[in-house]
């Protein structure tokens, strides 16, 4: 009985295993089910390990990609710094300044993403070199200081005597030398010339500008008188005055000596006044006539009256040489100056104050487009480098003209004082 039961139990065990295989290792109750599940544990562990390893490989594969991106970004930063260095080397051009600004903008964006300390150090070195290069440019304060120095220099140069005035003084002394050069003794001529040279140097050191101008006027008047010296006795008298002047000039440093020089010049003026003068003081001699250039302004009719009061007339131009002389005097002072020409009697017919008509050859002296009679312009003036017509009631400077005096060679004539001629009264 027992023998028949054992084969039957074996058959039941085999049947149970087949059922388990058909169900895919499905858990069932009983001891056999638990043993089957425990038998497949290593396979589950291997599956979990494979999943974890795959995740790690995916993460590792991402690291080289980010590193390569960082390296490429560092290369871009280095290239930008190289371009910036080259741009600083050519800093003088405005386009390069703009390029540097762009490079700095890019540098700012790149520095914000710097990952490695070594790149930061390299950028710091480049910035240090850039600072050194920029440091060689002139500082704004230095530029301002240079500008201030130039301003002071301009102001100092502005206080120097005008070149034209210096040239004029030199020309006056040259003419005076030529006049004195006609003295009989050659040795005396040389001595006088040397004295005038010393006098010129001494006058250049006088501190007071007003005193210099006064001495310049005295020398101008002396030139006018000496230029027409006919008598040996008068030449000797002037030579004596220059000798006295020499003694004063020789000790110029003291202020008292400067005053002494001024007194000597005053005495010299008094001596010259005893000579024959073709023109009064403050009048200018030219080709046998004397001319007075006013320092005040009047209208055209009052200018005629002012000239008549001193025995002259508002200037009438008779030659091209006279026109050139008067035009130069007017343009040099940059003044609008009346002349004795108008078309008051008949519009378009120009006449001088002495009644003579304007010659056709003189029409060339009108400025372009003149006379145009805009607003009843009937009187002529010196304007710029030519003539212009303007309203007669306007106040302007004026020029008087009269014939120069004739000098006799009689000694008594030279010893007698020249008649005093008043200047036109101020307006």
From Swiss-Prot:
Disulfide bonds join 279-290, 307-400, 379-392. PROSITE patterns: C_TYPE_LECTIN_1 (PS00615), C_TYPE_LECTIN_2 (PS50041). InterPro entries: C-type_lectin-like, C-type_lectin-like/link_sf, C-type_lectin/snaclec_domain, C-type_lectin_CS, CD209-like_CTLD, CTDL_fold. Sequence repeats lie at residues 96-118, 119-141, 142-164, 165-187, 188-210, 211-233, 234-256, 257-280. The keyword DNA damage does not apply. Keywords: Adaptive immunity, Calcium, Cell adhesion, Disulfide bond, Endocytosis, Glycoprotein, Immunity, Innate immunity, Lectin, Mannose-binding, Membrane, Metal-binding, Receptor, Repeat, Signal-anchor, Transmembrane, Transmembrane helix. This is CD209 antigen.
